[in-house]
C-alpha cells in the first residue's frame, strides 16, 4: 500500500498443490499456481474460476437442526427430527450433515444456473482469446472453453460452527451440564 504497511499473506504449497490437483490441474500447472482476488489459487491463462461465487453460512444448517428445518413457521430445510429426541452426538451430527447437504445442494443449483446465464448473456470473447483452449474448443471461458473450469463458493462462520458443535457435544452429550431442551430454549432467545 502507499502507507508501506502491506498485508503479508502466507500460502502453503503442501496444501495448495494437492488441492489444485484434486480439482483436476496437472502437477506442473498446480506447481505454477498464482493467487487471484484475496486467497483463491488458480493457474493463470488456463483457468476460468468464478471465485466468490457465493457465500455460504456454515452456521445456518446448525440452526436448522434445532428447528427441524423450520424458519418462522416455514419449512426451509430438511426435516431431521426433534433435536430434543437425539440421544447421541453422532445422531445430532448426522442431522447437521443432512442439513448441510441440503443447503449446499441449493447453493450448487443456484451457482449452476448462474453459470448457464453467464455463458448465454456474457460470453467474454476478448478474455477468451487469452485463455488456453478457448479458441481450440470454440467456446468462451463462460461456456467451459478454458483448460480448467470451476466455481468457488466461500464458507463462512466455520469457527463459530466448530465452536458450537464442540460446545453441544461437550455440554449436552458428554458432561450433561445442559439438556438439549435448555440449549434449544437458550438459542431461541439468542
Q: Which residues are covered by each model-predicted region?
A:
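Conserved catalytic cores of very large enzyme subunits
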Residues: 1-190
Amino acid at each position: 500500500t502507499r502507507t508501506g504497511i502491506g498485508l503479508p499473506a502466507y500460502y502453503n504449497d503442501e496444501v495448495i498443490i494437492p488441492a489444485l490437483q484434486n480439482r483436476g490441474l496437472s502437477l506442473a500447472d498446480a506447481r505454477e499456481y498464482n493467487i487471484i482476488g484475496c486467497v483463491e489459487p488458480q493457474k493463470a491463462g488456463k483457468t476460468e474460476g468464478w471465485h466468490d461465487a457465493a457465500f455460504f453460512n456454515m452456521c445456518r444448517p446448525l440452526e436448522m437442526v434445532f428447528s427441524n428445518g423450520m424458519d418462522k413457521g416455514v419449512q426451509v430445510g430438511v426435516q431431521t427430527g426433534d433435536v430434543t429426541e437425539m440421544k447421541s452426538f453422532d445422531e445430532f451430527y448426522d442431522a447437521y450433515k443432512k442439513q448441510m447437504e441440503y443447503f449446499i445442494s441449493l447453493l450448487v443449483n443456484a451457482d449452476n444456473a448462474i453459470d448457464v446465464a453467464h455463458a448465454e448473456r456474457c460470453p467474454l470473447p476478448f478474455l477468451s482469446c487469452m485463455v488456453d483452449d478457448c479458441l481450440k474448443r470454440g467456446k468462451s471461458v463462460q461456456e467451459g472453453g478454458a483448460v480448467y473450469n470451476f466455481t468457488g463458493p466461500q464458507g463462512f462462520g466455520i469457527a463459530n460452527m466448530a465452536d458450537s458443535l464442540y460446545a453441544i457435544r461437550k455440554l449436552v452429550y458428554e458432561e450433561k451440564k445442559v439438556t438439549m431442551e435448555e440449549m434449544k430454549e437458550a438459542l431461541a432467545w439468542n
